[in-house]
């Protein structure tokens, strides 16, 4: 029932925050590949958007032939291999069948540390010379496998991240990805729309209020100002919340909510073009930051820092930024993480921030 297609087509499992069920989508034919968000249909599908659209990472619109919803309680019984009588029940593997739990890191940490330091130095120089106000610098970690069940990982992410959007998708064009993200890019409830400015990161410590540096506060304020400016002229009845703290796994972020209405259905496409990528995953000025990322980062982001989710699918639009995510191949899981670099940033502190973010997904393994 939960097998992903092995050749052609597409399959998606997704769970929206604080719900007790997930949705399964299956398309029997190949998903539509789009050149730009300008071409994005406005209803009836699931969007998979990369950080930058290219031939290697196309923008996909999945039009499901099958849509089904499954209570988490029933899924848990199947996912753990326990049937109603408590005996072992078969569990269908995803297209990554043959993978196992990670035995070791395939990424040499010393080499990765050096690559990150060089990337940071280049990015930081751009900031100090006034080319950029902020830049998000990311890296990735390869972990070897040999028998992993992606469906079980999806269920584990649903349980450990109740406030996150959790998605598992597979297509021939993208491969298999698992995302557990706290950041909505654009979501709809009735006639009301919602997005957030989410930035600034400190470790979560139980019963200890987080302390925010001026760097973290300004980093988040940059994102909030950007989003407010992009909503100007397209959003009606705009309400901006006070900045507050939100927790996602082992880390805390600063968050500002924006709630509004849109005048026309086509404004959804226009707003996505305005918002993606936000300074929370790219930087400012946006075009210059995007070019710096492509020049300075040691590895391509692929679908990390893009977004995915249902768009006008049975009346539901929930598009979330692909922050905490991992990509599966028959031999590796590749985990992605990044952090905002400011003129006052310290390389060691930024490295440690990416380490904490990687732990969010590593703990699932």
Where are these regions (language model features)?
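Conserved hydrophobic core element of enzyme catalytic domains
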Residues: 266-365
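A glycine-rich phosphate-binding loop feature that marks nucleotide/adenosyl-phosphate handling sites
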Residues: 171-177, 228, 243-251, 307-310
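Structural signature of FAD isoalloxazine-binding scaffolds in flavoprotein oxidoreductases
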Residues: 58-74, 318-328
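Contiguous alpha-helical scaffold segments within structured protein domains
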Residues: 67-114, 120-121, 144, 196-295
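Terminal domain-start leader segments
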Residues: 1-23, 93, 98-150
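An anion-binding catalytic pocket shared by soluble metabolic enzymes
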Residues: 5-25, 139-222, 315-338
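Cytosolic ligand/metal-binding cores
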Residues: 25-27, 41-43, 73, 184-252, ...
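An N-terminal JmjN-like helical accessory module and its immediate linker preceding a catalytic domain
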Residues: 1-39, 43-55
């Amino acid at each position: 029932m939960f097998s992903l297609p092995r050749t052609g087509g597409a399959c998606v499992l997704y769970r929206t925050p604080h719900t007790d069920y997930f949705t399964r989508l299956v398309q029997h034919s190949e998903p539509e590949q789009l050149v730009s968000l300008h071409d994005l249909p406005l209803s009836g599908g699931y969007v998979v958007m990369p950080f930058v659209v290219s031939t290697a990472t196309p923008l996909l619109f999945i039009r499901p032939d099958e849509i089904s919803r499954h209570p988490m309680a029933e899924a848990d019984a199947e996912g753990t291999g326990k049937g109603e009588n408590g005996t072992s029940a078969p569990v269908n593997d995803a297209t990554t069948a043959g993978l196992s739990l990670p035995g070791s890191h395939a990424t040499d940490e010393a080499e990765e540390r050096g690559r990150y330091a060089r990337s940071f130095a280049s990015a930081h120089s751009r900031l100090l010379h006034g080319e950029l106000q902020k830049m998000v610098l990311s890296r990735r970690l390869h972990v070897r496998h040999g028998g992993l069940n992606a469906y079980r990982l999806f269920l584990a992410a649903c349980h450990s991240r109740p406030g996150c959007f959790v998605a598992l998708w597979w297509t021939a064009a993208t491969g298999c990805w698992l995302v557990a993200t706290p950041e909505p890019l654009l979501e709809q409830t009735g006639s009301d729309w919602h997005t957030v400015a989410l930035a600034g990161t400190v470790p979560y410590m139980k019963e200890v209020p987080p302390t925010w540096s001026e760097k973290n506060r300004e980093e988040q304020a940059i994102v909030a100002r950007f989003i407010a400016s992009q909503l100007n002229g397209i959003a009606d009845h705009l309400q901006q919340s006070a900045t507050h703290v939100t927790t996602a796994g082992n880390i805390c972020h600063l968050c500002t909510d924006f709630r509004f209405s849109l005048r026309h259905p086509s404004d959804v496409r226009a707003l996505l073009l305005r918002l993606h990528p936000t300074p929370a995953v790219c930087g400012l000025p946006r075009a210059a930051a995007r070019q710096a990322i492509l020049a300075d980062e040691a590895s391509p982001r692929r679908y990390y820092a893009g977004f995915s989710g249902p768009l006008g699918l049975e009346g539901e639009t929930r598009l979330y930024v692909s922050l905490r995510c991992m990509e599966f191949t028959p031999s590796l899981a590749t985990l992605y993480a990044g952090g905002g670099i400011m003129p006052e940033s310290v390389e060691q502190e930024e490295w440690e921030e990416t380490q904490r973010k990687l732990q969010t997904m590593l703990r699932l393994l």
